[in-house]
Each structure stands twice: as structure tokens, then as C-alpha cells.
Amino acid sequence: MLGVESMNVDFKDFTNQLFFQTVFAQRFLIGAGAEYKHIKIKSNTAPGINPVFDDSDYASAFGYLKFDSLDDKYFPTEGYYFSGEAKAFLYSSDYTGQFSPFTLVKGEIGTAKTLFKGFTLNFQGETGMSFGENVVPTFNFVLGGYGYYATNNFRHFYGYDFMSLGGNSYIKGLISADYEFYRRHHLNLSANYANVGNNLYEEGKMLSLPQYSGYALGYGFETILGPLEIKHSWSPETNKHFTWVSVGFWF
């Protein structure tokens, strides 16, 4: 879009939240609150345009529901997971001049099942969408890369580099086979598929055949400081290969 294959981006996010949460039916975590966020996005390598893409304050109200019975965050062998959140953006200082109130809704679901000793299948699905006339591009869903803490609407996606795919709505599925061949040592094979774009639900494209796919072969080692992971991934759409190294817990 900007006539370059890649560029460096500085992303600064300062967030404060005030929220209340409780346990519902001894299984579900439910909560609601308010959020203040300041985001600044700039790039000194984007040619011919204003290097600052956003420098705004945002105020929002949100609610969420979570359920998590997985026995491990990084290498689960049994259990289920669900997370749903709705967030209404009500105010912005509007650096871009594009803001009007809008709402983001997103959800995740997953399960892990051990088929035999040391061998586990993991299934995950997630989706996100926006409602409103002018959704600020800052809050688009952005897919690509692996090994980072998935803050805001940045999501992992094997086979594509960081921030490669984006839009105001998406749906993604992941299947992974993990084999613990020695205590705390894992080999895994993963495949993910997604549709990403603008207004996918409104245009009926959400459940069409996936536009994007990627595959990854990985090794993981559980340490007291968090997992050590190496992932090599590839996408048949681009024929590009990426290797990522992740060390420690994600914060």
C-alpha cells in the first residue's frame, strides 16, 4: 500500500484500567470496567507520508467472560478454554480525525486432548469484529508472527511475518499436535487458517474458504523461567519461510 515491502514501526501503548470481576457458578470469571488508553504509532521509514499514524487518547467501557480448565498455558494436555470480550470506545482526542464511537467484540475457544502418553492434540478458534461507522485503523485486528504477548488486537499467525494481515474483522482456526518425547521437551506440528479483512460478517465472507494459511514445525523446552521455543513456519500463498525464537513467559 505504501510501496515498500517492510518498514520499522514504533508502537507505544499506555493503558490504565479500573474493573471489577467475580467468579460465576464457580467456573466462569466475569468482569466489567472502564479503560483509558494512549496510543502513539510512528514510522521513520514510511516514505512520503506523515510519520505519525496515531497519537490519541481513547476512553472505553468493557465487559468479559472467561473459562479456563487447561492444565498448562503453553503446553496443555487436557482441558477447555473460552474467552469473550466486548469493548465500546466512547471518546477519543482523535489525532487522525477519523474517530466516531464504535464497538469491538472478540472471542476465543480452545481444547486440548491427550490421545496417548506424551501425544496431545490442541484445537483453537478465534474471531473478532467491529461495529460502527468509522472504526479507527489503530484497532484493526492484525495477524502475523509468533512469540510476543498478544496485546490489543495483535494475534499470532504462522506463515506470515509480524503485522502482515489486517482488517476490522477476522476468523482464525488452529490445530496443533504436540509430542513430549522426553520430560519437558516437546516437538510440535501446527497448521492455522484465517480470513481477514473489512466487514467480513456483513459481506458473508466469514465462513468462506480460508484466504490465508500457514504451517509450523517447532521445538519447546519447559524451564523455570518459562518456555524456550523455536518455530519454523511456511505459507503456501507466499512461499516465504520464517523462524522465530521465544524465550520465557509472555507478559
Model-identified regions with their sequence ranges:
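Sequence/structural signature of outer-membrane beta-barrel proteins
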Residues: 37-43, 68-72, 87-95, 112, ...
